[in-house]
Amino acid sequence: MSNVVPTPVSPLFAQPFATRLERALQHLRIGRPVILMDDFDRENEADLIVAADKLTVPVMAQLIRDGSGIVCLCLPGETLDRLELPPMVDSNRSRYSTAFTVSIEAREGVTTGVSAVDRVTTIRAAIAPGARSGDVVSPGHVFPLRAQPGGVLTRRGHTEGSVDLAALAGLRPAGVLCELMNADGTMMRGASLERYAAKEGLVALAIDELAAHLQARGATGAPAELAVAA
């Protein structure tokens, strides 16, 4: 179960899931971020996610300012294959098999690559229709993640959740995320997460809720199905 139990006891989950999901999809369509939480016995993390299609420089600055600074671009395998981005390591021994590729930078239009403007430029280059390997270089300051086929029905990760939500919103199946952190460097959870969500006016969803929603509708996680499963 998620760190903040999805009952009316927590203001994050005071509204029914269907209501929060519709609000979240509306926010993603206009470029606003959404909080996505995983299970308590997994990473126990709250990530700030945004649809890559709608990413803006101010939102990127928010991800960097309020998160860990490690901004990830979550993409389906076919997009990463077209960009010819290999895995970061040959043998992935991380606890949850998080599928990092080599980091990237836009080939053109960036300076150091680390500013909010430069990271947005890199992400736009990577998700552009027809983007190819020559449009990005490695290493860089954006960290692509390979979403597993089947989305959260296959792997209960933020990577898959962000791609699934973008597809549910009718957008390109590509998400951008960063783990939320407190000012003291600890992960943002519990009461501090509730305060942050209230201050920023953000919707929160849990991955287990999203998976249950998709299972109930018989979705397989394919982007075309997700676009009509909301």
Curated annotation (Swiss-Prot):
Origin superkingdom: Bacteria
An example Gene Ontology biological process: riboflavin biosynthetic process
Positions contributing to D-ribulose 5-phosphate binding: R42, E43, D47, R155, R156, G157, H158, T159, E179
Assigned GO CC terms: cytosol
Heme among keywords: no
Catalytically driven reaction(s): D-ribulose 5-phosphate = (2S)-2-hydroxy-3-oxobutyl phosphate + formate + H(+)
Pathway assignment: Cofactor biosynthesis; riboflavin biosynthesis; 2-hydroxy-3-oxobutyl phosphate from D-ribulose 5-phosphate: step 1/1
Binding site for Mg(2+) 1: E43
Job description of the protein: Catalyzes the conversion of D-ribulose 5-phosphate to formate and 3,4-dihydroxy-2-butanone 4-phosphate.
NCBIfam families hit by this protein: ribB (TIGR00506)
Family in the record: Belongs to the DHBP synthase family.
Protein name as annotated: 3,4-dihydroxy-2-butanone 4-phosphate synthase
Organism encoding this protein: Bordetella parapertussis (strain 12822 / ATCC BAA-587 / NCTC 13253)
Gene: ribB
